[in-house]
Swiss-Prot record:
PROSITE patterns: HTH_LUXR_1, HTH_LUXR_2, RESPONSE_REGULATORY
Main location: cytoplasm
Protein known as: Oxygen regulatory protein NreC
GO CC list: cytoplasm
Phosphoprotein listed as a keyword: yes
Domain HTH luxR-type: 148-213
Changes after translation: Phosphorylated by NreB.
DNA-binding region location: 172-191
Modified residues (4-aspartylphosphate): D53
Naturally occurring in which organism (per UniProt): Staphylococcus haemolyticus (strain JCSC1435)
Length: 217
């Protein structure tokens, strides 16, 4: 099978490439340092599996790239590689098209099992995350209700400018410089956005921005 690895750390890309290329049934055909490059490599090589870090530089995070790649190249199975052993992140990446979720500290045997599992079209979740959580997600995956009273309509013009920048991974300082405002102003708007939209975490904000088509790729 053909594999692409996307991670912003060169040592991770090199280490995982060595592990996978040692297997007779696996070949790493390309690597990428961010989500945008991952998209280009997938488009170029049409790999069977994309192993992608969830946290990469601003602009093309793993979560955003997952949604984009899974929609454009459904034949490529995405395995998320991350440090987050939090079911909240798991739910978001599965909802956005990933087929697997594995922690960076997982043993080599588990990584190989994960790759082979998603290659077959099956879902793989790191052993540290329980089966009950996955079952709960599957049962409620298609039950999202769309509210008739959309809080999006009450966001201010400035909040509408800041929301997609946060979702793309820009930090408060970067946003402040981009919009010529203070960091404290950005922090205040960020708090207002989370409150108005009833969002509890950044992954929820990213998913919301994707649903509202606020992100340009």
């Amino acid at each position: 099978m053909k594999i692409v690895i996307a991670d912003d750390h060169a040592v991770v890309r090199t280490g995982f490439s060595m592990i996978l290329n040692f297997q007779e049934d696996m070949e790493v055909v390309a690597t990428a340092a961010d989500g945008g490059e991952a998209y280009q490599k997938v488009m170029e090589h049409k790999p069977d599996v994309l192993i992608m870090d969830l946290s990469m530089p601003p602009g093309e995070s793993g979560l955003i790239a997952t949604s984009k790649i899974s929609e454009s190249f459904p034949e490529t199975k995405i395995l998320i590689l991350t440090m987050y052993d939090d079911e909240e992140y798991l739910f978001h990446v599965l909802r956005n098209g990933a087929k697997g979720y594995i922690l960076k500290n997982a043993p080599d045997e588990q990584l190989l099992l994960a790759v082979r599992t998603v290659y077959k079209g099956e879902t793989y979740v790191d052993m540290k995350l329980t089966t009950s959580l996955v079952n709960e997600f599957v049962n409620h995956k298609h039950s999202d209700d769309v509210s008739t009273n959309d809080p999006f309509k009450i966001l201010s013009k400035r909040e509408l400018e800041i929301l997609p920048l946060i979702a793309k991974g820009y930090g408060n300082k970067d946003i402040a410089e981009k919009l010529f405002v203070s960091v404290k102003t950005v922090e205040a708007h960020k708090t207002h956005i989370m409150t108005k939209l009833d969002l509890k975490s950044k992954p929820e904000l990213v998913e919301y921005a994707l649903k509202k088509k606020l992100l340009d790729f």
